[in-house]
UniProtKB/Swiss-Prot annotation:
Main location: cytoplasm
Gene Ontology MF terms in the entry: beta-N-acetylhexosaminidase activity
InterPro entries: Beta_hexosaminidase_bac (IPR022956), Glyco_hydro_3_AS (IPR019800), Glyco_hydro_3_N (IPR001764), Glyco_hydro_3_N_sf (IPR036962), Glycoside_hydrolase_SF (IPR017853), NagZ_Beta-hexosaminidase (IPR050226)
GO CC aspect terms: cytoplasm
Record protein name field: Beta-hexosaminidase
Localization of this protein: Cytoplasm
Gene3D superfamilies found in the cross-reference section: Glycoside hydrolase, family 3, N-terminal domain
SUPFAM superfamilies, per the entry: (Trans)glycosidases
EC number: 3.2.1.52
Catalytic activity, reaction form: Hydrolysis of terminal non-reducing N-acetyl-D-hexosamine residues in N-acetyl-beta-D-hexosaminides
């Protein structure tokens, strides 16, 4: 069977279960789609996951980019057969107790194990690291954050990024310009952060500046309003994305929207309007999760935005190690020692009350 050549479009969709239905195959063959994000509902065991990712990648060329939210702690989509990853705050605790060097070493090992295990299963990308500061205000961020100190967050995220690269993965810093100060969960409400730009620059934006200089591949903006900067949520704001992120910070990588079905995105209009405004604001790729009917709505009469960099940016996010090479790495004593070390950092309470973050069913 001839595999159709379909350039990757600017939409990342999802699927319902462990295998592709015929309807889902047709949806993923649409030129609007360029990638797919997987959730817990798509994982039964490692062999099933490998079969699913191979099936997805066989649909078209260039292959769809396959992503997952696999941060560690409360947000780890795949559990059985994978190393249990610690909450990122565990690395911050090591920073405080044992110093920067020990914490950075641990972060590098976490990144390496995280990426290699996913690479072995055909996954291209995990949406990590979380660059939000832990101000103690935001339960949905909480221990997903490395630390409250911007310097610690930046250094630990950079170490994690280096580990990800060893496992064949790029980094995606989130949630620009910072979700940690607000109380609300943008999956459920539209939070407001009333601080000034100068206050944000002095704290929350610092990790984004540093990571951008150090090769961060992608950024995901927050569905949060910062009314002293713009009345629109950051992910729909040209001020935040084109002016502050691109021009002022100098970020040259990929901008992914956060999920456009989240409550924090719903005040902007219907899905087509949300996508249009996201693209106009500066997003390269939009995520539409948990609502395949809305993906179909978006596909109708969809006009792919003019973005000459899209193909290159998609390709930049592709895995660089490959499944077979990653599986070979996993057989080495050195990697197995890293797995044991990382597993020793995790604790049962890491999963408490939060493993469904971002999942609707």
């Amino acid at each position: 069977m001839t595999v159709p050549h379909i350039p990757r479009g600017p939409v990342m969709a999802d699927i319902a279960a462990f295998r592709l239905t015929e309807e889902e195959k047709q949806r993923l063959l649409d030129p609007a789609v360029g990638g797919i994000i997987l959730f817990r509902r798509n994982f039964q065991n490692i062999e099933q996951l490998k079969t699913l990712t191979a099936e997805i990648k066989a649909l078209r060329t260039p292959e769809l980019i396959i992503a997952v939210d696999h941060e560690g702690g409360r947000v780890q989509r795949f559990i059985e057969g994978f190393t249990r990853l610690p909450a990122m705050s565990t690395l911050g605790e090591i920073w405080d107790k044992d110093g920067a060097s020990a914490a950075e070493t641990a972060a590098g090992q976490v990144g390496r194990v995280l990426a290699t295990e996913l690479s072995a299963c055909g996954i291209d990308l995990s949406f990590t690291p979380v660059l939000d500061l832990d101000w103690g205000n935001c339960p949905v961020i909480g221990n997903r954050s490395f630390h409250h100190n911007p310097e610690a967050v930046a250094h630990l995220a950079l170490a994690l990024q280096k580990g990800l690269a060893k496992g064949g993965m790029k980094s995606c810093g989130k949630h620009f310009p910072g979700h940690g100060f607000v109380e609300g969960d943008s999956h459920l409400v539209l939070p407001e952060d009333r601080r000034s730009l100068s206050e944000l620059e002095a704290a929350d934006l610092a990790p984004f500046h540093i990571m951008s200089r150090e090769g961060m591949a992608a950024v995901m903006p927050a569905h949060v309003v910062y009314p002293q900067v713009d009345t629109k949520p950051a992910g729909f704001s040209e001020i935040w994305l084109k002016q502050i992120l691109r021009r002022d910070i100098g970020f040259k990588g990929v901008i992914f929207s956060d999920d456009l079905t989240m409550e924090g995105a719903c005040g902007v209009g219907g899905l087509k309007e949300r996508a249009r405004i996201s693209f106009e604001a500066g997003c390269d790729i939009v995520l539409v999760c948990n609502r395949p009917d809305l993906v179909d709505e978006l596909r109708e009469d969809f006009r792919i935005p003019d973005n000459p960099a899209l193909a290159q940016r998609w390709q930049y996010m592709a895995n660089t190690l490959g499944s077979a090479a990653a599986q070979a790495v996993m057989q080495t004593a050195d990697f197995q020692e890293a797995q044991a070390f990382v597993a020793g950092l995790a604790s049962p309470q890491d999963t408490a009350g939060g493993v469904k973050v971002g999942e609707a069913f």
